Amino acid sequence: MSALGHRLFAAVYDTMMAPSEQGALGELRDEVIGHARGDVLEIGAGTGLNLRRYEGVERLVLSEPIAPMRRRLAGRLGDARVPVEVVDAPAEDLPFADASFDTVVSTLVLCSVADPVAALAEVRRVLRPGGRFVFLEHGAGEGSRAVWQHRLDRPWAAVSAGCHLTRDVAALLPAARLTIEELRVLEPHPTPAIVLPFRLGVAVAA
């Protein structure tokens, strides 16, 4: 997506997401962030919709590579209940030493990274042994929905900052040496059917 496209997407993102955020999606974010412990990294923090949900963690680092999103995120830093550091970095190339974090969080991010396999390898690298990767991601459905997701994947990505409809993040975790501890497949409403289902899970660094 072009720089102009990123600016426009950042400008409308919160408004576009508001109906879902005020419903089940907001509750799912609460659940995901409730798993965060110790030193925490959130990849693809976007406009900061999770920020106010963090409590009782030792350290919080928010990674966001898109400048217009970071500017929106900066406007929410006053909502934080814990010390926060914001870093300009993509999920595929994190500027942290190995074994730096107890928890890595990803909510609606891995659908749009350029290389989800590389991103998950980085997640595993920066997690301490026994650390947790907590995620809420949408992606590949089944049956007729999967057919339509494949048909619409390219045009959808073109207008939604590279968001893909066909990824199954949970299926990529074992290759990254992340062992699934909990996984639920969900259909929160109101959410467009084309982006369903969502997968909420916890995986442990092997």
Locations of the language-model features?
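Class I SAM-dependent methyltransferase SAM/SAH-binding core
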Residues: 41-93
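A short acidic, Gly/Pro-enriched loop at the edge of an enzyme's catalytic core
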Residues: 89-104
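A short SAM/SAH-binding and catalytic strip from SAM-dependent methyltransferases
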Residues: 102-115
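A short glycine-rich, Lys/Arg-flanked "PGG" loop and its adjoining helix->strand segment in the class I
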Residues: 117-129
